[in-house]
């Protein structure tokens, strides 16, 4: 990602962070947790979990982990503190349904490059995590890895808190 791309992503985060009701939906595998070869060893990045804890505590902000895995397994791998109760778990095909359920006015959708998320609505923000995958034809903004996702989530949390 070039410096200009990063500036553009940060401006997009500034815009969407002000939406009245935000849904942050992140793929677990490849979005929050790096692919280490063995899916049972996958753990969410610590900084991502911390940022999600902050977002979970904010009013009018819904956080969802998107995964085909069993919700109990994902919960164990997330490294979340007491805020686990507010975390939503949905399959990739159910993000739109959750958006409607919580009446979100904006969505940040973080997806791994090997996933093809459903198209977003105007004003939503797509972030694709390459994880050494190809960047050709991927939707939205592109970040290199799960550590970059952690930075994005920290920025969203900071902006939503107003600090």
For each of these PLM feature ranges, what is it?
Residues 36, 74-77, 120:
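A short acidic (Asp/Glu
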Residues 28, 66-69, 131:
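Glycine-rich beta-strand-to-loop/alpha-helix junction loops that act as flexible
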Residues 1-28, 32-36, 79, 157-163:
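Non-catalytic pre-domain segments flanking phosphatase-related domains
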Residues 8-9, 48, 94, 149:
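Amphipathic coiled-coil/heptad-repeat helices and related helical stalk/stem segments
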Residues 91-163:
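C-terminal cap/substrate-recognition subdomain and adjoining C-terminal extension
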Residues 15-63:
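Active-site neighborhood of HAD-like aspartate-dependent phosphohydrolases
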